[in-house]
Each structure stands twice: as structure tokens, then as C-alpha cells.
């Protein structure tokens, strides 16, 4: 009896020993090249997405900075308005007090004149 052949059978994948294995009829490394190209395409797609996201983050940061500046300016304007409104309120309160004192004085003079006119 003879010993069985030590290498793979001639009809097995890859054919003769020492040759790369792969699907029948496919050139060697085609599938690995295809996988590598797919992976590289995915990496490029992810890199593009990351670039877009970074651009969006930078744009958002710029808009937030501008919004913060506008909010600070608005806060300063509100503080200035509040102080000028308080000054204006005091001014017209004193003006109103002066008017009431003048009306009270005129009323008192009229009452005194009436009293003097009727009792003399």
C-alpha cells in the first residue's frame, strides 16, 4: 500500500502547494485589495465627516462668541437704562413735590385771603 499524498489535493483551493489560497478563479490578493480599498474609502469618509464636524464646531464657537459679545453689550445698555430711568424718576418726583408745595401755598393764600375778606 502506498502512503496518502502529503500535500493538498490538486482540486482543493489554491492548487499546488506554495501558491496563495483564494476563491477559485480569483487572482491572488484581489479580495484583500478590495477590502483594503473599502476600508480606505470608509476612513476617507470618516475623515471628511470629522472635517465637516470640526468646521461646524469652529463656526458654532464663533457664533457663540459673537452672541456673548452682544449679550454683554445688551447687559451694559440695560444697566445704563436702569440708572438713567432711576435718575429721571427722582427728577420728576422732586418736580411733582415742588408742584404740590406750590399748589398748597397757593391754596393756603386763597384760604387766608377768603378768611381775611369775610372776617374784616
UniProtKB/Swiss-Prot annotation:
Topology Cytoplasmic: residue spans: 1-98
GO biological process, one term: vesicle-mediated transport
Gene3D superfamilies: 1.20.5.110
Segments for region (Disordered): 1-38
One Pfam short name: Synaptobrevin
Tissue localization of expression: Nervous system specific.
Domain v-SNARE coiled-coil homology: 35-95
Membrane topology field: Single-pass type IV membrane protein
InterPro entries xrefs: Synaptobrevin-like (IPR001388), Synaptobrevin/VAMP (IPR016444), V_SNARE_CC (IPR042855)
Biased composition (Polar residues): 29-38
GO annotations of cellular component type: neuron projection; synaptic vesicle membrane
Cell location: Cytoplasmic vesicle, Secretory vesicle, Synaptic vesicle membrane; Synapse, Synaptosome
Family of this protein: Belongs to the synaptobrevin family.
Function: This protein may play a role in packaging, transport or release of neurotransmitters.
Protein name: Synaptobrevin
Amino acid at each position: 500500500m502506498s502512503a496518502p499524498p502529503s500535500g493538498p489535493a490538486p482540486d482543493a483551493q489554491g492548487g499546488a502547494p506554495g501558491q496563495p489560497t483564494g476563491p477559485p478563479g480569483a487572482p491572488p490578493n484581489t479580495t484583500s485589495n478590495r477590502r483594503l480599498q473599502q476600508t480606505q474609502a470608509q476612513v476617507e469618509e470618516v475623515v471628511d465627516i470629522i472635517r465637516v464636524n470640526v468646521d461646524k464646531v469652529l463656526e458654532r464657537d464663533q457664533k457663540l462668541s459673537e452672541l456673548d459679545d452682544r449679550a454683554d453689550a445688551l447687559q451694559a445698555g440695560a444697566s445704563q437704562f436702569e440708572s438713567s430711568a432711576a435718575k429721571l424718576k427722582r427728577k420728576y418726583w422732586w418736580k411733582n413735590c415742588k408742584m404740590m408745595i406750590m399748589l398748597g401755598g397757593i391754596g393756603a393764600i386763597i384760604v387766608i385771603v377768603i378768611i381775611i375778606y369775610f372776617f374784616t
